[in-house]
Amino acid sequence: MSDTKKLMLFEKQAEVAQALAHPLRIAIIDFLKGGSQCVCDIAEHIGSERSNVSRHLSVMVNAGLLEYHKKGLKVIYKLKCPCILDFFACISGVLREQAKQNNRLLKVLE
């Protein structure tokens, strides 16, 4: 792959990563791992206003993380690529390693 193509790929990957870079968006993805949900249920579950949730959902749809369909008056969202959950499992692994390192550091400092 040429350097130009690699750079384009990295830019697109950064766009997806930016769409994940908010705690409410991560909470939404975590909730949607249980299946499709309407905006009203997502907002209630994460404890945020529907307008705020809709804005975050829009960012994630534009990044290709979520898809939606209308069911009557409701808009139903679901994970477009459930493999994103593997990414969060990896992040949890990184956090566990950090915690181990911090625990070792605390023991050294005691």
Regions found by a protein language model. Name each.
Residues 36-37, 61, 92:
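Residue-level detector of secondary-structure transition/capping positions
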Residues 57-58:
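Short, hydrophobic-biased segments on the C-terminal half of alpha helices
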